[in-house]
């Protein structure tokens, strides 16, 4: 859930994941620009790719009017946040020139801001971060974990939410060969802890930070990704107050799903994507990043109804 920030803000009861072994994993609230995200239920982040070459929907929403219609459709379907991307980060994707990325995403931020839904920008470029925040973005979602020179300086001030993701390597080469880890869960958690600490050392409040284990980004397609999903609560480092940083999980239509459902192409991975989202929220994910908003929202309504009945 999101609430407008102001002089006062009431925090509803936080999410209790389940009565299972992960029931003590309670996401802390996340400050997110104009909003405060209070996770008494998991939130759905809808993907809006203003790109010609994204692995699943490349080219469908490159035109501004098409992108705006898709955003309005997601809002009607019950989306909680919209994540706007102007550069594909699929394995092997080439970088996009700065001016081109700005031209793709900034007009969308400006056009969507009046719709009163939290807006996230999927970028690793400091100049895009600055421009997006100036245009009214509420969250910066960085696959590089704010490791690019100038990235932390670009986001240090203000109240925007910041999502630091784990990636081994870089998009062009991250899936070349088999990624190697000592222990993937420990390695990912240690990396995310270091990135959160780097942000905090620069003066960023812990309440602005969330983390993403980076499914599909420099991970063995089956072994690493499913190990991370199975142990999802263990990937989140602790904040100074002892609560876990909120987890954003993005598995929608990815190859880790295709690999276990007979190699179906991305557009035929909807059911698998919804199943993965449910597995993630059962294991404590605060936000799931998805292409298929309506299906995910409906599935989570059923999941929440079961949880409510179990509490009675």
Predicted regions mapped to residue ranges:
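Active-site-adjacent loop and "lid" segments of alpha/beta metabolic enzymes
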Residues: 24-27, 39, 56-70, 89-110, ...
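Catalytic domains of carbohydrate-active enzymes, especially glycoside hydrolases
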Residues: 73-85
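N-terminal amphipathic alpha-helix/helix-capping segment at the start of soluble metabolic enzymes
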Residues: 16-49
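Short acidic capping loops at alpha-helix termini that bridge into adjacent secondary structure
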Residues: 205-208
């Amino acid at each position: 859930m999101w609430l407008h920030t102001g002089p006062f803000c009431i925090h509803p009861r936080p999410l209790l994941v389940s009565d299972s072994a992960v029931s003590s994993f309670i996401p802390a609230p996340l400050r997110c620009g104009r909003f405060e995200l209070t996770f008494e239920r998991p939130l759905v982040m809808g993907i809006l790719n203003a790109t010609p070459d994204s692995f699943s929907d490349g080219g469908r929403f490159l035109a501004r009017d098409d992108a705006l219609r898709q955003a309005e459709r997601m809002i009607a379907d019950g989306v909680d946040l919209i994540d706007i991307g102007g550069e594909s980060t699929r394995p092997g994707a080439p970088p996009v020139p700065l001016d081109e990325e700005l031209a793709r995403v900034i007009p969308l931020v400006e056009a969507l801001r009046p719709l009163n839904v939290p807006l996230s920008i999927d970028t690793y470029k400091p100049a895009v971060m600055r421009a997006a925040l100036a245009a009214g973005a509420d969250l910066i979602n960085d696959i590089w974990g704010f490791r690019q020179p100038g990235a932390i300086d670009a986001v240090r001030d203000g109240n925007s939410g910041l999502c630091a993701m784990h990636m081994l390597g870089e998009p062009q080469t991250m899936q070349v060969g088999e990624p190697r880890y000592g222990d993937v869960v420990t390695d990912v958690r240690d990396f995310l802890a270091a990135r959160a600490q780097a942000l905090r050392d620069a003066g960023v409040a812990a309440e602005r930070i969330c983390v993403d284990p980076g499914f599909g980004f420099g991970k063995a397609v089956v072994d690493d990704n499913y190990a991370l999903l199975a142990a999802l609560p263990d990937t989140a480092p602790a904040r100074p107050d002892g609560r876990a940083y909120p987890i954003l999980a993005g598995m929608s239509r990815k190859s880790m799903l295709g690999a276990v459902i007979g190699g179906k192409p991305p557009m035929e991975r909807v059911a698998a994507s919804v199943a993965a989202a449910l597995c993630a929220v059962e294991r404590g994910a605060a936000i799931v990043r998805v292409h298929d908003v309506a299906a995910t929202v409906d599935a989570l309504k059923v999941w929440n109804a079961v949880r409510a009945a179990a509490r009675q």
